[in-house]
Amino acid sequence: DGLAAHDLSAARARLASCELPFNLSESYISLSDLGGSVEAVAVPRLLTQAWIDVVDSADLPLRRVDWLLSAAQRGLMQLTNDWDGDLVWLLIDQGSGRLVLHRGGVPEVDHSFSADDVDGSHQLIRQLIGAWQGLLDEPQPLGWWLSISDDLSPHWCSIVEGTAGEQNLTQRLTWSPELWDGDGFSEALSPVEHLAMFALHQEEQ
């Protein structure tokens, strides 16, 4: 809090006083505005340069570098801008789950879990949401965004309790990137990758 998303110098000074799982002096820092707060993402310089070299060796143009979840979250905020309540973002991919609970555009809870047991995961998610709402002064109606593939969606959509006033805000994205298959092979984007690419596309307009 109290930082501007464009003030990298102030952010580095503030982060220097924190216990961090990375070496600040050897990392690139990216800042994003989140509902009046600032999200900081760091990545080692050597790792970034290694990926730049990979792109260069493939003779592909590199226009920008971004973090998948950070970009996807920006897309999420764009698409749910009209929602006034609290926001639940549920990500399920290859047996792994992630629950991110937002209030006022700020992610307050970020919890990863195994999603192999759907019923058990439903119970865990409800417990986490209940505990979170118990800490809030005035819990708001819940809106859900489900970043889940179509084949898994039927197992998870029931977690949204419409009878309790909850709403499923998930929608089909209006833009998709063109597939590139130089070697005759293409793979569909996961929902969170699609959301991130959608955000980057919108920001380029």
Regions found by a protein language model. Name each.
Residues 1-205:
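Hydrophobic/aromatic-enriched cytosolic interaction surfaces used to assemble or bind macromolecules
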